[in-house]
């Protein structure tokens, strides 16, 4: 009962992993969003403060990084999240089909804010499977090298986020912004 699809979107989860952190905390801390210093956090400046590139600790070594932390980036469409950028645009009331591809070696649960969606089909290891039971969701897991198609509709104008629902991946850049435009 979604109606005709009016727009199609495609996003790709990517990751660029380097060597494990063996004494390279300064390299990790100099990567955007990696120092994890939340001293400037407050309810008023929240996410903007945390993701701001002018953090006073950027480029400094962080002694609280776990020794197993990998350096690299978690991205969507080969881009690290930037609050100043709009990645996708949708229109209120339009039915959309999104193709979400996981081009990485680990699972990434996709989460879309502000609405729900139905999984239409999945493709993994050369097999395409149409969803036999469709229910409204706001998260769907993508296995390594899996593609999932969802159908959704935004009912309210405004800014939304979509991201990997593993907090560490989201914080390391695997997030995008969706601007929903009213009619």
In which residue ranges do the predicted regions lie?
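Short loop/turn segments at connectors of secondary-structure elements within structured domains
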Residues: 104-108, 158, 172
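Extracytoplasmic/periplasmic copper-protein system
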Residues: 1-3, 33, 173-183
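Short, hydrophobic beta-strand segments
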Residues: 150-155
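Glycine-centered flexibility sites
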Residues: 93, 145, 158, 173-176
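Edge beta-strand plus adjacent loop/short-helix module at the start
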Residues: 1-137, 141-149, 166
């Amino acid at each position: 009962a979604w109606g005709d699809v009016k727009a199609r979107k495609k996003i790709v989860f990517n990751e660029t992993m380097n060597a494990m952190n063996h004494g390279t905390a300064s390299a990790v801390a100099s990567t955007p969003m990696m120092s994890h210093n939340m001293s400037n956090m407050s309810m008023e400046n929240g996410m903007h403060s945390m993701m701001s590139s002018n953090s006073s600790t950027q480029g400094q070594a962080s002694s609280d990084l776990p020794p197993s932390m990998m350096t690299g980036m978690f991205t969507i469409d080969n881009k690290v999240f930037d609050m100043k950028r709009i990645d996708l645009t949708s229109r209120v009331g339009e039915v959309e089909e999104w193709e979400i591809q996981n081009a990485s070696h680990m699972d990434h649960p996709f989460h879309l804010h502000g609405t729900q969606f139905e999984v239409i089909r999945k493709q993994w290891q050369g097999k395409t499977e149409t969803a036999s039971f469709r229910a409204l969701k706001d998260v769907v897991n993508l296995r390594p090298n899996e593609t999932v198609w969802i159908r959704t509709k935004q009912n309210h104008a405004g800014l939304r986020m979509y991201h990997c629902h593993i907090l560490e991946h989201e914080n390391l850049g695997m997030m995008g912004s969706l601007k929903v435009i009213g009619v």
